[in-house]
Amino acid sequence: MPQFNGFKIVPKVQIDDKDVLSLVYTPGVGACCQAIAKNLESAKIYTNKINSVAVVAFDYAAALKRAIFLKSALLIDAYPLVISDETDKNDFKFAIENLEINFCAFDLSLIEDYAKDIDFNVEIPVLKGSVADLKDFFGAISRNVFMLDIKSLKGTVQERSLQLHELSGGAIETELTEEKRNKPVAIVSDGTAVLGFGNIGALASIPVMEGKAALYADFADVDAFPFCVKTQKSEEIVKIVEMFADSFSGIHLEDISAPSCFEVENKLSENLNIPVFHDDQHGTAIIVLAGLLNSLVLTGKEISNIKIVISGAGAAGTAVAKLLHFAGAKNIVMTDINGVVYKGREQNDKYLEELAQITNPSDERGELKDVIKNADVFIGLSKGGILKPEMIKEMEYQPVVFALANPEPEIMPDIAKEAGVYIISTGRSDFENQINNSLAFPGLFKGLLEGKVNKVTDEIKLECALMIASMVEEDELSTDNILPDALDCSVPVQIARVIKEKFGS
């Protein structure tokens, strides 16, 4: 009989080709998000919520022991969560009510005396004391024991993703291990900026978070699970994450809209002694820079001499502009729903005004169609269909277009090529030249954790981008191949290595 000392997160389906990746992650996973947004009860069908239990304790070792027992005895995917015994009970009540969307039950039996007089307003069971037969309490939880043939799924990517998630009951589960492992990473979202759907709520965002967790597990052997919150107030998100921070080895922020995402990341980075990383910002920026560096090799241009137009000044667009500027870009022009971003613009908040200080050096005005003229590079982080063929024809020789809106890019690749684009990339795994964060965040967090690095700096992001770009061999680099394959398992290993070597303690 093995002696279990920990658990790891594992994908329910092995991500071994791009087709499976497109079902577990983008673009297919968006169909699951939309289905849940229309019918919240369907989260029980398309995610692992129905078999996920939170075990709360004052001590991580005690919570872990309980989680191991629940998995070994009842096949329940139990996640240890730790709070301080000095936590205000009203704050704890608020946190539990926000976190219920992730789980089918809370096990508070290890903090029975603390929790017994708290009246939780939740729709799922809360176990406050011991019970004679745990199966009576957890008996309604369904299990998914199956043999799934991916090739048997029929229909579009979206239809097959729905089928896959329904058959597997979500994308992840826990597996007991004999070795001790790092605490997991929390994938935190409020659901305000999910893929290209906008604010569809935290519950509907869970399929994306499970997909991220599956990629962490498969590509980097990093344990992570969804920690989504109902509240959409930045100060409340921070409060909840800080309350449970001792449960985690790192915080991965995902699909939180601007400017809230900046406030949440800044505050958590200041207050916590573990890495905090907003993937929509920095994962995107790293991959865009890597792709741009290799594109410039092909065009023979220098980053300091080109004009870059970025459509979308939200979380991703802001981070991309800042990292490109850090890497040497001198002429970046940003556009958003109000047109070109410039200093002193009436619609600027403090973050856009800060961005205006390092962009638009010629003080251009107007809209996207005005500033795209003579641009060498277009980077779309906005919405589908906004880049028109006639705009491409006004760009410089050998134009580079990164149309990264999901699920519909700013322009479809075939249309872009007909208009004269030299290099076209999208965020989708079903097209060539995918620019996707999945190349960056698994290895980045692996390196941060193994190197005991607690802060993500611009220097780290630049090194990650340089490493990713360098992994496309010179004889393999082409207009249709500017980045390593999304399933290249050597990428996260090399990213982790460079972080540990250059920044590790």
Regions found by a protein language model. Give the residues of each.
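N-terminal ligand-binding/catalytic initiation module
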Residues: M1-S130, E173-I274, K502
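Glycine-rich phosphate/diphosphate-binding loop of Rossmann-like nucleotide-binding domains
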Residues: Y60-K65, F69, L74, N182, ...
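Amphipathic alpha-helical dimerization/oligomerization modules
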Residues: L99, V145-T174
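Adenosine-phosphate binding glycine-rich loop
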Residues: D85, P275, D279-D280, T299-K301, ...
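Rossmann-like adenosine-cofactor binding region
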Residues: E353-I423, R428-D430
